[in-house]
Amino acid sequence: MDLQLTTNSTDSGDRGGSSNESLQRQPPSQYSPAEVAGLAAVVSFLIVFTIVGNVLVVIAVLTSRALKAPQNLFQVSLASADILVATLVMPFSLANELMNYWYFGKVWCVIYLALDVLFCTSSIVHLCAISLDRYWSVTQAVEYNLKRTPRRIKGIIVTVWLISAVISFPPLISLYRDPEDDLYPQCELNDETWYILSSCIGSFFAPCIIMVLVYVRIYRVAKLRTRTLSEKRTVPEGSSQTENGLSRPPVGAGPSTAAAAAASLRLQAGENGHYHLHHHHHHLHHHHHHHHHQLRKSAELEDIELEESSTSENRRRRRSREEAAARKGSRGFSFSFSSTKGGQSAGAGSRLSRASNRSLEFFSTHRRRKRSSLCRRKVTQAREKRFTFVLAVVMGVFVVCWFPFFFTYSLYGICREACQVPETLFKFFFWIGYCNSSLNPVIYTIFNQDFRRSFKHILFKKKKKTSLQ
C-alpha cells in the first residue's frame, strides 16, 4: 500500500502566490540522478524476479504430478496475487517514489490504491485459509481428505478473494485527493484515524492472529498424536507381525518352523494312507482383519506425525529386504510326509504342491497390494507433513515482512506526530513488505524437494530442448 505519513495540502486562501513559491522551492524528485538509477535498477530486478519466480510456482503446480494435490491450488492463487502486485502495483509505486508526485491521473490513482490494498489483504487471507486447511487435515484426517476436492478448494479460493474485497474496498470510498489544479498531485489514502486502524486490523492483525492461533493448535494436536502413535507402536520383544496378519517366527527358529508359520498349512497322515491338507483359513482371515484394523488406525495417526520422513532410498532398501525375506520363506517352505504306497504319496505330493503354490501366490499378491497401498499412503503423508512445515515458514516470513509497516502505520494513526517514525525508515518498512511477494518461490525451492525438482525440470528441460535443436 503506497501510503504517505505526510501530506502536501495547503490552505485554499494561500494558493495564489505561496503555493507557486513552495512548488518552485520543492524539487520534483528527492533523489539525485545516481540514486534514481540505483533504486530503479534494484526495484526493477525485484519486479522481474517476483514475476518469474511466481510464474514458475504456477507452472510447477499445474504440471508436476507430485504437486497435483488439490490443496496446492492455494499456492497458485497466492502466486497469482504476487504476480499482480509485481505488475500492477510495484511499477507505479516506484515511479511515484522517484518522481515524488503522482503522474498517472486521478482515475488510475483510485484503481491503483484499491488493487494495492486488495492484493496485500488477499495474501494474508490466503495464508489464513491455508492454515485452516492444514488444521482440518490434521484433526479430521480421513473425513476432510475425502471432502478436499479441487472444486471445493476453488470455492474456498473464490471466497478468500471476496472476503479480501469486502475488507479492502469500502474504506477507499473516502480517499484523500489533492485539488485538480495542483502542479504535483499526490495519490494517497485517507489519513483519518478510523481508516488507518480499521485497515490495519482488517488487512493484517485480525487474520494474523487467527493464523498464529491455528498453527499453535496444529502443533499441539500433532505433538499429542505423535506421542500416542509411538505408544501404539510399542510391541513386546520377540513378537511381531507380517503385513498379511501372520505372526513372524522367532529369530532363532529353524526352516521348518518358518515354513509352517508362513503358510499356516499342516499335513497329517491317516491310518489308511490318505493325506489331509488342513488350511487354517478361518484363523488367517481373523488375523488379517485384526491386523488391517490396526494398520488403518496407525495410518490415521500417522497423518499428523510431523517428524516422519520418507525418502525413495529408504523405500528401496525396505522393499529389497522384504522381497529377500519372501524369497527365503518360499525356498524354506517344505513338506514332509510318509506313506506305504509310492503312487499315492506322489499324487498327494503333487496335489499338495499345487495347493501350497496357490496359497503362497494368494498371500504374496495380497501382501504386495497392501504394501503398495501403504507405501503410497506414507509417501502422501510425508509430502503433506513437509509442506505443512514449508507453509509455516511462508507464514512466518510474511508476518516478519509486513509487521513493521503495519505496526508503525497503526502507531501513527493512534498518536500521530508523537509516534511518527522517520520517513526514510517508514518507506523502508513499506518496501520490505513488497519484497515478500518475491520470497515465496525462494522458500519453496529451499525447503520443498517437490518444488525444487519441478523447477529444475521446467528450467533445464527447456534448455535441453533448445540445445538439441
UniProtKB/Swiss-Prot annotation:
Residues 279-296 have a biased composition (Basic residues). Pfam families: 7tm_1. The chain crosses the membrane at residues 37-62, 74-99, 110-132, 155-175, 195-216, 387-407, 428-448. The record marks S199, S203 as: Implicated in catechol agonist binding and receptor activation. Residues 331-353 have a biased composition (Low complexity). It is found in: Cell membrane. The record marks D116 as: Implicated in ligand binding. Its main location: membrane. This is Alpha-2C adrenergic receptor. It comes from Didelphis virginiana (North American opossum). The gene is ADRA2C.
